Curated annotation (Swiss-Prot):
The lineage of its organism: Eukaryota, Metazoa, Chordata, Craniata, Vertebrata. This is Nucleoporin-62 C-terminal-like protein. One of its GO terms (cellular component) is nuclear pore. Belongs to the nucleoporin NSP1/NUP62 family. The gene is NUP62CL. One of its GO terms (molecular function) is structural constituent of nuclear pore. GO terms for biological process: protein transport. It comes from Homo sapiens. It holds the Pfam family Nsp1_C. The keyword Protein transport applies. InterPro entries: NSP1/NUP62 (IPR026010), Nucleoporin_NSP1_C (IPR007758). Keywords: Coiled coil, Protein transport, Transport.
């Protein structure tokens, strides 16, 4: 599709012999670049201003390049859609692969969580058993200390009684020996 050329021309003349001229030409084609040339200038009436030393014309020219959007055809659009569909399918495969991995990791985490829960219960049970055993050991230790105290007391009592008993036995023997000696 091609646009028609547009041409604008503006001219104004002042009362003192000064004129301002602008011309603009624009050509636009939808599939190509457009170049716009603008020419501006001052025209001075020579008769009135020649004595002042002005030149006839002071031109100013500028060029502007405009980039137009290219035309898209049905075939080009269909090609882009097919390319996007292929990219989407690749991304879908990659997503499903990652989802499968995440699912496997999730399953592993759930199993490990269950194992941790079981181990936590067993550790708590062992802690309770250990606490119970420590209490029993403390009880046995206190009984052992009490028995040692009682044994020490009994041993001392027995020694004291043995000593008296030994002295009594010795006295009885001494009396008996003395009695026998007196009989002879």
């Amino acid at each position: 599709m091609q646009f028609t050329s547009i041409s604008n021309s503006l001219t104004s003349t002042a009362a003192i012999g000064l004129s301002f001229t602008t011309s603009t030409t624009t050509t636009a084609t939808f599939t190509t670049n457009t170049t716009t040339t603008i020419t501006s200038g001052f025209t001075v009436n020579q008769n009135q201003l020649l004595s002042r030393g002005f030149e006839n014309l002071v031109p100013y020219t500028s060029t502007v390049s405009v980039v137009a959007t290219p035309v898209m055809t049905y075939g080009h659009l269909e090609g882009l859609i097919n390319e996007w569909n292929l990219e989407l399918e690749d991304q879908e495969k990659y997503f499903l692969l990652q989802a499968t991995q995440v699912n496997a990791w999730d399953h592993t985490l759930i199993e490990n969580g269950e194992m941790i829960r079981i181990l936590h219960g067993e550790v708590n049970k062992v802690k309770l058993d250990q606490k119970r055993l420590e209490q029993e050991l403390d009880f046995i230790l206190s009984q052992q200390q009490e028995l040692e105290f009682l044994l020490t007391y009994l041993e001392e009592s027995t020694r004291d009684q043995s000593g008296l008993h030994y002295l009594q036995d010795a006295d009885e023997e001494h009396v008996e020996i003395s009695t026998r000696s007196a009989e002879f």
